Amino acid sequence: MRLGAHLSIAKGLPRTAAMATSIGANTFQYFTRNPRGGAARQIPGKEIQAWREARRRADLYPIAGHLPYTVNLGAAAERQQEFTRMVLHDDTLRVAAIDGEYLISHPGHYEGERQAGLDRIIQLIEEAYLSITPPGPMLLLETMAGQGKEVGTIDDLCYILEGLGWPDRVGVCLDSAHLFAAGWDLRTPAGCQQLVQELAAKIGLDRVKAMHLNDSAAPLGSHRDRHAGIGKGELGREGIAAVVNDPFLGELPLFLETPVANYEEYGEEIALIQKLKSV
């Protein structure tokens, strides 16, 4: 089981590796830059060398960078498009520099017509990401709750992937809280299997690479993005157990993004999930 959490790399990647180990994680996700804006931290070559050794010792895999919330792949305004294009391009290279496997992004919001927004997402990914010569991290588009003009249903992601020509370098990251808020009832094994069947039919399971494992503070089908601690939300322990024991969902790399006061609380959630895995 590959299970970890969203951790900071502000004090250096080797320290993040040590933190992951201390909470019982064998994978982690991090923001590629300040999630609310600002310049990216430059990672020195010596730090990258130390990181590679620390990662090897800790058996951390996979590593996922997450683009900041200020990125909007569906932006209509030219200034916002330029910013998003720059961040997607530059942060792809930054994740590649530390040998990260995945780069996760919210698909974004549309302005005006929904299809026009989806088409802008396709164009921006082509220009800023697919233009980069491999190897590099696989871009994973995240399933979203569907707040307002937010893009991120399974049908949306299918449209984007089809528009891109189904490239091997673009895939999907699920989010249990977002899916629940979007109307997918994951509280039972049958509900989880219904989701898996939909993914198999429209996306292809080989393209689904990771999941953000979060409980939901928002009700089923509410289209509100509100995370809760593991077992403390609408999914509850029973729902989290259904997800982690699903033959497909439970074998994905799982990243916690739950509201915690400190990283030690992530450790408590990881221990709980490991117990639920055997239920």
Curated annotation (Swiss-Prot):
Enzyme nomenclature, EC number: 3.1.21.2
Binding site for Zn(2+) 3: H178, D225, H227
One annotated GO biological process: base-excision repair
Reaction(s) this enzyme catalyzes, per UniProt: Endonucleolytic cleavage to 5'-phosphooligonucleotide end-products
Top-level taxon of origin: Bacteria
Record flagged with keyword Transmembrane: no
SUPFAM superfamilies: Xylose isomerase-like
Cofactors that this protein relies on: Zn(2+)
Enzyme superclass (EC): hydrolase
Binding site for Zn(2+) 2: E142, D175, H212, E257
Gene3D superfamilies assigned to the protein according to its UniProt record, in alphabetical order: Divalent-metal-dependent TIM barrel enzymes
Alphabetized PANTHER family for the sequence: APURINIC-APYRIMIDINIC ENDONUCLEASE (PTHR21445:SF0), ENDONUCLEASE IV ENDODEOXYRIBONUCLEASE IV (PTHR21445)
NCBIfam families for this protein: nfo
Protein name per Swiss-Prot or TrEMBL: Probable endonuclease 4
Source species: Moorella thermoacetica (strain ATCC 39073 / JCM 9320)
Taxonomic classification: Bacteria, Bacillati, Bacillota, Clostridia, Moorellales
